[in-house]
């Protein structure tokens, strides 16, 4: 693919022209499996936070609407 290469000790680096690269190679093909795996791996870590957020927002909305009913002219 790329012709230019440099050797620094035991590390070999290759440089590729921007015209030889493909943008988002297999990005959309691999996005759904990666998303599914990420949700599955982090499900039990993130659910308590979303549950606490839902309970807090629900309580705040209910309190706000009850106060608005009391102050109705």
Swiss-Prot record:
It is a single-pass membrane protein. One of its GO terms (biological process) is mitochondrial electron transport, ubiquinol to cytochrome c. Pfam families: UcrQ. The keyword Transmembrane applies. Disulfide bonds: none annotated. Keywords: Electron transport, Membrane, Mitochondrion, Mitochondrion inner membrane, Respiratory chain, Transmembrane, Transmembrane helix, Transport. InterPro entries: Cyt_bc1_su8, Cyt_bc1_su8_sf. The keyword Mitochondrion applies. It is found in: Mitochondrion inner membrane. It comes from the Eukaryota. Component of the ubiquinol-cytochrome c oxidoreductase (cytochrome b-c1 complex, complex III, CIII), a multisubunit enzyme composed of 3 respiratory subunits cytochrome b, cytochrome c1 and Rieske protein, 2 core protein subunits, and additional low-molecular weight protein subunits. The complex exists as an obligatory dimer and forms supercomplexes (SCs) in the inner mitochondrial membrane with cytochrome c oxidase (complex IV, CIV). Component of the ubiquinol-cytochrome c oxidoreductase, a multisubunit transmembrane complex that is part of the mitochondrial electron transport chain which drives oxidative phosphorylation. This is Probable cytochrome b-c1 complex subunit 8. It comes from Dictyostelium discoideum.
């Amino acid at each position: 693919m790329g012709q230019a290469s440099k050797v620094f000790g035991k590390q070999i680096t290759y440089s590729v022209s921007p015209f030889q690269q493909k943008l988002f190679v297999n990005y959309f093909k691999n996005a759904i499996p990666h998303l599914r795996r990420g949700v599955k791996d982090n499900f039990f870590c993130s659910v308590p936070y979303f549950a606490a957020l839902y309970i807090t927002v629900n309580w705040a909305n209910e309190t706000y609407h009850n106060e608005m009913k009391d102050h109705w002219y």
